[in-house]
Amino acid sequence: MTIAQTIAQQLGRACLGLLGAHTLVDLNDGLLFQIQGSEKVDVIQIILHPSDTYIMTFWKIEKETRKLTAEIPFTTMTWRKVQTIDQVYWDDLHHLIEEETGLYTRF
């Protein structure tokens, strides 16, 4: 199992579903995904630190432009870092996501 798969499993299907998570990206040392429904955060990045804790970074997409180049659609995005939190234990993931996004992660 990869680190990204482990993080996704720790978050759980319900959490990812409630966040409207999509475009999950395996970063080798972590997981990055987009969410829907939050006015403060659009992207969450969770990286495994060598201390066996996580570094969570929350991003807001400020600008998104799409254009066709040689009939291929390209998207350009400008991201703004909202918050970075170090030394996060796996059992704090839900609480911190709820705090930063304003969205529920559990029923």
Each predicted region: which residue ranges?
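Short beta-strand micro-motifs enriched in acidic
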Residues: 47-51
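Mixed-charge, Lys/Arg-enriched low-complexity segments
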Residues: 62-107
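Ser/Thr- (and often Asn-) enriched beta-sheet segments in non-cytosolic proteins
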Residues: 32, 55-57, 78, 84
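Short, surface-exposed beta-strand/strand-loop-strand elements in extracellular ectodomains
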Residues: 52-65
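Negatively charged, low-complexity tracts enriched in Asp/Glu with abundant Ser/Thr
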Residues: 1-38
